[in-house]
Amino acid sequence: MKIKTRFAPSPTGYLHVGGARTALYSWLFARNHGGEFVLRIEDTDLERSTPEAIEAIMDGMNWLSLEWDEGPYYQTKRFDRYNAVIDQMLEEGTAYKCYCSKERLEALREEQMAKGEKPRYDGRCRHSHEHHADDEPCVVRFANPQEGSVVFDDQIRGPIEFSNQELDDLIIRRTDGSPTYNFCVVVDDWDMEITHVIRGEDHINNTPRQINILKALKAPVPVYAHVSMINGDDGKKLSKRHGAVSVMQYRDDGYLPEALLNYLVRLGWSHGDQEIFTREEMIKYFTLNAVSKSASAFNTDKLLWLNHHYINALPPEYVATHLQWHIEQENIDTRNGPQLADLVKLLGERCKTLKEMAQSCRYFYEDFAEFDADAAKKHLRPVARQPLEVVRDKLAAITDWTAENVHHAIQATADELEVGMGKVGMPLRVAVTGAGRSPALDVTVHAIGKTRSIERINKALDFIAERENQQ
């Protein structure tokens, strides 16, 4: 049997991390079994579904490289198919027309609740033989079995049972002729030959209804697996107050897709004590029986740790392709300065996100208007003039501009003046970067370049002279 899974988001907003994890689990299960992964857009909610949301979902899937083998299919383009199946069910007697008014249904609901009963349709039209005009408004309901129970073996939670007496006669077509969500899902899974449905636990109550409809259609019933929800680190349902929840917001915040995927796969699944997984390892090791039944807690610090790992573990040339977007957001012209791959090597240890890297690299490419006030006050003082003049001259004398030779020039300055490296290094760092913090000074000066470094040292000397004149 060929394994076939699907990810079926409703395009009413962005792709959130819960949906992304569900998509990842479905994708991994299919890839692990050499099967196929289908993308289906469940856009039957015409009022809330938007083209922007569809685009956001696609962007998130593409950024995570969760490629699909079929689709995207759109439910709104399959209404004729759904209605044809409903008409077939009406003929076979597994569905019926319901003419009950909203007023009657509301009165029935209130009466049942007053008695402490669970609100449900009483089946009046199921057993009615009244004649109605063809154009009289009605809904179509599924004739749910009235006896027995629905049992399915959830691949994560184990056997789950629902009594048919607890299930309503579900509306499968509205008065406007549009099919309902639960019915469309059934026909789609049938037509698309989905073998395994992996989705959130909020769909558990839909499952017995969908199984009954599939059986009424004499269609194969897929295997179901319901993934637990994701909570914030405070144990409450994950929401914006816990930080970003949109996949693309993590892109915007400077995370690599590899880091988010690695974090999401471990958010409810484990393979021994292993924490770091390549995409290939995820595919090789992923199984549903290793997915936890318990809710997971989203920990941003753990994700940040993973992101820092991947910034330094992945090839710098690859990381640079993602960094480019953030550089563009900062409007930095990188034509005069180090290659972005070299920048990744320079800043990788210091920066935990690509956004942080982009925001802290401008001095490599563009001159700054002024020095950081605190750093200048502390390090660009008259006592720094001589070390800066000497190191400037030694840097200017370098014919082979390498980080090693830059280091020798700084060390030689300290030796000549018989001062510690800090007496040379800190004024030099502020002079060439404009701030008090940077990567190792030799590689920083080397990356900034000989001409620009000397110009900035001269600017720092002018700054010191100006301060002296003001005193």
Curated annotation (Swiss-Prot):
Keywords: Aminoacyl-tRNA synthetase, ATP-binding, Cytoplasm, Ligase, Metal-binding, Nucleotide-binding, Protein biosynthesis, Zinc. It is an enzyme of class 6 (ligase). A motif ('HIGH' region) lies at residues 9-19. One of its GO terms (biological process) is glutamyl-tRNA aminoacylation. It catalyses: tRNA(Glu) + L-glutamate + ATP = L-glutamyl-tRNA(Glu) + AMP + diphosphate. ATP binds at residue 240. Its cofactor is Zn(2+). GO terms for molecular function: ATP binding; glutamate-tRNA ligase activity; tRNA binding; zinc ion binding. It is found in: Cytoplasm. Pfam families: Anticodon_2, tRNA-synt_1c. Its EC number is 6.1.1.17. GO terms for cellular component: cytosol. A motif ('KMSKS' region) lies at residues 237-241. Binds 1 zinc ion per subunit. Disulfide bonds: none annotated. Belongs to the class-I aminoacyl-tRNA synthetase family. Glutamate--tRNA ligase type 1 subfamily. HAMAP family: Glu_tRNA_synth_type1. Catalyzes the attachment of glutamate to tRNA(Glu) in a two-step reaction: glutamate is first activated by ATP to form Glu-AMP and then transferred to the acceptor end of tRNA(Glu). Monomer. This is Glutamate--tRNA ligase. It comes from Shigella sonnei (strain Ss046).
